[in-house]
Regions:
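Extended, subdomain-level signal for the structured scaffold at the beginning of enzyme domains
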Residues: 1-106, 110, 118-130, 138-188
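Active-site-adjacent substrate-recognition loops and nearby beta-strands
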Residues: 134
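Catalytic nucleophile serine of serine hydrolases
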Residues: 114
Length: 188
């Protein structure tokens, strides 16, 4: 294990179903390998069912906490995985929306991949930002006042916080590297 991100606290949030497996597992495992402490919080502190490509059942994960029980101020970055069902459920969760607003207001980075930016739309934090996502979210993001680009990873600064976005599981290496780079700058 590397000490590159030693002392850094990462919060990954999900619903309890429909999470794209690699979009939670890869950031969790790779950020831990770099020394970060990673906490997974779900809407409920019950099993989280993951899938591959939204359709193929995969692992069942046990979250570390329920969303309502985490203090967003205790973390250095918020990570939002995709999965169509996961993102759709998260964006309708009042606690998830409030958590996003709290993290942004505190000036901490938020990283979202694939369908994860749907939650950012509902939390009203994407206006005047440039970001990427799964292509089917493009219209929703544009309607929310964001600029959308088709790139593996996009970093966007504004309103005192940084937003990092990626399109899909193929972009995970770039996504994780961008998160690690942002955290390295903040902790150096």
């Amino acid at each position: 294990m590397s000490a590159e991100l030693e002392g850094v606290r990462v919060l990954i949030i999900t619903s309890n179903s429909g999470v794209e497996r690699d979009e939670i597992a890869v950031p969790r495992d790779r950020l831990r390998a770099r020394g970060a402490h990673v906490t997974h919080a779900a809407v409920e502190e019950i099993d989280v069912h993951t899938y591959r490509h939204d359709l193929i059942p995969s692992e069942t994960l046990r979250p570390d906490a329920a969303l309502a029980d985490v203090d967003p101020g205790a973390f250095d970055v918020l990570v939002i995985p995709g999965g169509t069902v996961n993102a759709d459920k998260l964006r309708t969760d009042v606690g998830a929306r409030e958590l996003v607003r709290s993290v942004a207001a505190a000036g901490r980075p938020i990283a979202a991949i694939c369908h994860g930016p749907w939650l950012l739309v509902e939390a009203a934090v994407v206006a005047d930002r440039t970001l990427t996502s799964y292509p089917s979210l493009r219209t929703d993001l544009l309607n929310a006042g964001a600029a959308w680009v088709d790139e593996p990873v996009v970093r966007s600064d504004g309103d005192g916080w940084t937003l990092i976005t990626s399109r899909n599981p193929d972009d995970l290496p770039d996504f994780v590297d961008a998160i690690a780079a942002e955290l390295s700058v903040r902790t150096s």
